[in-house]
Amino acid sequence: IWSGIQGAF
């Protein structure tokens, strides 16, 4: 799951 630009799973 991409969280904004951070790309946190």
Curated annotation (Swiss-Prot):
Keywords: Secreted. Signal peptide: none annotated. The keyword Ribonucleoprotein does not apply. Expressed by the venom gland. It is found in: Secreted. It comes from the Eukaryota. One of its GO terms (cellular component) is extracellular region. This is Venom peptide 1. The lineage of its organism: Eukaryota, Metazoa, Ecdysozoa, Arthropoda, Chelicerata.
